[in-house]
A protein has these predicted regions:
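Histidine-acidic metal/acid-base catalytic patches
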Residues: 1-31, 64, 89, 97, ...
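Residue-level detector of anion-binding/catalytic polar loops
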Residues: 31-32, 69, 105, 146, ...
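Conserved beta-strand positions in the central sheet of alpha/beta enzyme cores
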Residues: 34, 72, 108, 148, ...
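Glycine-rich, proline-tolerant flexible connector loops at the mouths of alpha/beta enzymes
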Residues: 34-58, 117
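Conserved radical SAM core fold
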Residues: 37-43, 79-80, 113-117, 154-156, ...
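Short glycine-enriched, charge-decorated loop/helix-capping segments at active-site entrances
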Residues: 45-50, 123, 164-165, 229-233
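Short, well-ordered beta-to-alpha junction loops that form the rim of enzyme active sites
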Residues: 75, 110-112, 150-153, 193, ...
Length: 285
């Protein structure tokens, strides 16, 4: 199984300079990058189509020259009512185009979630997602990009604090059901291991539920309470079960890390990343 890393994991040390991130990935021996377009410092929405194409084609060519490819991107996400706006829809369409310019196969997308204590029913939320993604399908087909719905959580205020709230799409059977309802060869799933652990779901079982619709991964550990984005074996996830699950469904994608910087010290963090990938290599042998 190939390994990769999210550009978000490197962004604090390179001021989100995508070319420097490629150099870092090469030094780490990583051959795949998950480009975080939701946090990009390049304004791909408000430049011309030609300019955006030139930028991401140049980035792709630089990556290829260094033995690296962009296996997936991450689209922007927002809250209600922003995701009902034409502006947000156009941003996602532009993200699909930029994903294509990078020659990346997949774009990770957060399902749309209505706010806590709203008057919306779950069925309305499901239909909202179906309608939104159906509007995207012509663009996904035109640019040959596959959308991967990620298992997510949301937030709510409790006793003056913002705390994690599990939602419909925190649970594997619900996410798979949504994908089945859309029923398109261009729509699949991204498994976020930390989010699944927060939902107290068995990740092996989740992988089996996702099965052939599991196309991309966000790999990180946690203790099941906070979204720690920690390296493997530093939380409570059973990584051998994760490996076995991926093998059992014949997963051939990228084992892509999405871990937070562990220190503000640049050299220390790069050393920590090297150690993180040693753990990955040991697991996947």
């Amino acid at each position: 199984m190939k390994t990769g890393i999210s550009s978000w994991s490197l962004s604090k040390f390179y001021n989100k300079n995508e070319f420097d991130m490629i150099d870092c990935a090469k030094n780490l021996g990583v051959t795949n990058i998950d480009l975080d377009l939701k946090g990009s410092n390049y304004d791909f929405v408000n430049v011309s189509e030609t300019t955006a194409c030139e930028h991401y084609t140049q980035l792709k060519d630089y990556a290829y020259a260094n033995g690296i490819r962009f296996n997936q991107t991450h689209a922007a996400y927002t809250t209600y009512p922003n995701f009902t706006s034409d502006q947000y829809f156009k941003k996602i369409v532009q993200t699909i185009k930029c994903t294509s310019y990078l020659n990346a196969k997949y774009m990770v997308f957060h399902p749309l979630v209505f706010p806590y204590n709203s008057n919306f029913e779950v069925e309305e939320e499901i239909q909202c997602n179906i309608d939104f993604i159906n509007r995207l399908l012509p663009y996904l087909k035109q640019y040959n990009v596959k959308l991967c719905l990620e298992n997510i959580y949301d937030w709510k205020m409790e006793n003056g604090q913002n705390i994690i709230r599990l939602v419909h799409y925190s649970f594997p059977q619900n996410l798979r059901m949504l994908v089945n309802k859309i029923n398109s060869e261009y729509v699949g799933i991204c498994l976020d291991t930390g989010h699944m652990n927060i939902a107290k779901e068995n990740i092996y079982n989740a992988i089996k539920i996702f099965d052939n619709k599991l196309w991309t991964l966000h790999i990180h550990d946690c203790f099941g309470e906070k979204d720690d984005h920690s390296p493997l074996f530093s939380g409570t996830i059973n990584w051998y079960e994760v490996k076995n699950g991926l093998e059992d469904i014949n997963f051939t994608g990228v084992f892509s890390l999405e871990i937070k910087p562990l220190s503000n010290e640049h050299d220390y963090y790069l050393h920590a990343l090297n150690d993180a990938f040693k753990l990955v290599d040991g697991l996947l042998k």
